[in-house]
């Protein structure tokens, strides 16, 4: 069985954001605007996306 994945794109800059938000973007493998990252769809990744929801956009949401 294939694991579910989620694709996210960074749409906001981490400049003048809290260090924890910058670290969350690094954890999501994002570092520059309009970069796309594909990660395994797990509760921890979903929580990280929720933490920086104002800086990222979910491109593919298999759960919806």
Swiss-Prot record:
GO process annotations (BP): translation
Keyword Cytoplasm belongs to the record: no
Keyword Acyltransferase: no
MF term (GO), any: structural constituent of ribosome
SUPFAM superfamilies: Ribosomal protein L30p/L7e
Superkingdom as given in the UniProt entry: Bacteria
Assigned GO CC terms: cytosolic large ribosomal subunit
Entry-linked Gene3D superfamilies: Ribosomal protein L30, ferredoxin-like fold domain (3.30.1390.20)
Keywords attached to this entry: Ribonucleoprotein, Ribosomal protein
Alphabetical list of InterPro entries matching this protein: Ribo_uL30_ferredoxin-like_sf, Ribosomal_uL30_bac-type, Ribosomal_uL30_ferredoxin-like
Transmembrane stretches, start-end: none
Subunit structure, as described in the record: Part of the 50S ribosomal subunit.
Family per similarity comment: Belongs to the universal ribosomal protein uL30 family.
Protein name from the UniProt record: Large ribosomal subunit protein uL30
């Amino acid at each position: 069985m294939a694991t579910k994945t989620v694709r996210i794109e960074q749409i906001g800059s981490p400049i003048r954001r809290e260090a924890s938000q910058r670290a969350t973007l690094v954890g999501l493998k994002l570092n520059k605007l309009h970069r796309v990252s594909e990660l395994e769809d797990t509760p921890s990744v979903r929580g990280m996306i929720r933490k920086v929801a104002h800086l990222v956009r979910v491109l593919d949401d298999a759960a919806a």
